[in-house]
Amino acid sequence: MAMLLLAAALWYLFGYPAPPVDLQWRAPAATQIPDDAVTVRFAGTSTMLFSDGETQWMTDGWFTRPRLSQIALGQVAPDPAAIEFGLKRLDAQRLAAVIPLHSHYDHAMDAPLVAERTGALLIGAEATANIGRGLGLAEERMRVVEHGESVQLGAFRVTFLESRHLEYADPDMVDKLITQSEIPAPLVPPASIYDYKLGKAWVLHVAHPKGDFLVIGSAGFVPGLLDGYDVDTLFLGVGALGSQTAEYRADYWQETVGAAHPERVILIHWDSLLAPLNGRLQGEMRIAGLLSGGNERLHEWLRARRAANPQLVFQTLPRFEPSLLFP
């Protein structure tokens, strides 16, 4: 009996609960795409491919899903097969850029290999460049940017705004991944997830003739940062937001959605960091959720935000399929 109970407990802890979003929020996949439309494809977490038919570029480019055992042993590394699979499913051809939203492993670990395979420029903080150097990416294939700097990618103008990362509930993680923010030398994998320091947490403001949008990868904020950046669509990172206080969540909403006045909010970074890339989008593994906390609180809060803002189009994205951002 004891063995059965142990097996049941392990099955539960290492299983995936329902995600903290409602299925009916999912945007439809585009069946017909006008030649000049701007589209987005979502691979999971905050990896997205944007295209206007002329130019493709990507946030994060993270496709590897390290196992818990690899994370525990400090042995995470890019998985070339997963990267090839993800790029193929996204129909990523020749990318203008891959832009990690910060330098943690679940954003930047694969980005240099994505750049190498697609011809993209790797753009980000110095920490991101040191991830690229550790994987042998040539210096001319990387660009280090600072707060307020803009990069032109075809008709897309991307402006980098330095924000803050959400603070984890675990003080040790805060110290190792946020307070110690720099990667001071080329990072050669396999490595610990704690070696993938924050670097800088970017919010991207993207201007295009068809419409403007913001991409917020981490549920952190700087008061007043987004004042004056009104946009049509806001991609809102909500990872681990349920672990924060109700006051923090209210402030986060006000400093993002409240500041930018979007017509549409698209949720990102709500799915599991461990579930297979070739499966459906899942909630975080229960044992990982116990560490980050708040999956149910996040779901309740998102439902409440949607109900309180009926004028907003409130969406998630299908996996890998194109969705119309601006027809």
Describe each region flagged by the PLM.
Residues 129, 133-150, 254-327:
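Binuclear metal-ion centers of metallo-dependent hydrolases, dominated by the metallo-beta-lactamase
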Residues 66, 104-109, 129-131, 149-151, ...:
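Active-site environment of divalent metal-dependent phosphoester hydrolases
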Residues 59-62, 94-104, 123-126, 214-219, ...:
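Active-site neighborhood of phospho(di)ester-bond hydrolases with catalytic His/Asp-centered motifs
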Residues 1-30:
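N-terminal membrane-anchoring alpha-helices
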Residues 143-211, 288, 299-327:
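Flexible, acidic/histidine-containing loops and adjacent segments that form or flank the divalent-metal
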Residues 33-86, 197-217:
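Conserved beta-strand hairpin/beta-sheet module of binuclear metal-dependent hydrolase folds
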Residues 55-99, 104, 109-113, 168, ...:
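Pre-active-site segment of Zn-dependent metallo-hydrolases
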